[in-house]
């Protein structure tokens, strides 16, 4: 067992040594990468941003500040004018859209409810209260009388089946049955 423990310790020591070497290599690579990025940043700034040239006297610096303030004021005025134009045009667009909807009649209509109305009430609503129109649709129909057929008469004669059963139940009912047969 002692031999195996020594081997395990040697393996773990070797692993730790390899990890530390790998971390050192990675750290140097990161430093090189940061240095390269900083150099790229300096090159980009040198190409795209001209160096600042400061005039020597205080009067020249004040003059430069006045010029810059004048440019800022001009830019602000243009910005304000553009905002006003945009607001006007958007308001005109809204008004034109509203007129377009008015002309088309595309208002949101409320849902209609179903109302039961007789023909007389409908005509009264359409024509007004001055005109009196009676639309009794049943008046024009033919009247048909129902003729009794033989089957219907027989059914009426039989009557309610409960009555027949009650009459035939008991001794008197059976007596009547025998008397009627003979």
From Swiss-Prot:
The family this protein is said to belong to: Belongs to the troponin I family.
Gene Ontology MF annotations: actin binding; troponin T binding
Gene3D superfamilies per record: 1.20.5.350, 6.10.250.180
Residues covered by region (Involved in binding TNC and actin): 97-117
A matching Pfam family: Troponin
UniProt KW keywords: Acetylation, Actin-binding, Muscle protein, Phosphoprotein
Residues modified as Phosphoserine: 118
Subunit-level organization: Binds to actin and tropomyosin.
Protein name (database record): Troponin I, fast skeletal muscle
Transmembrane residue ranges: none
A biological process from GO: skeletal muscle contraction
Record PANTHER family: TROPONIN I (PTHR13738), TROPONIN I, FAST SKELETAL MUSCLE (PTHR13738:SF15)
N-acetylglycine: residues carrying this PTM: 2
Region of interest: Involved in binding TNC: 2-48
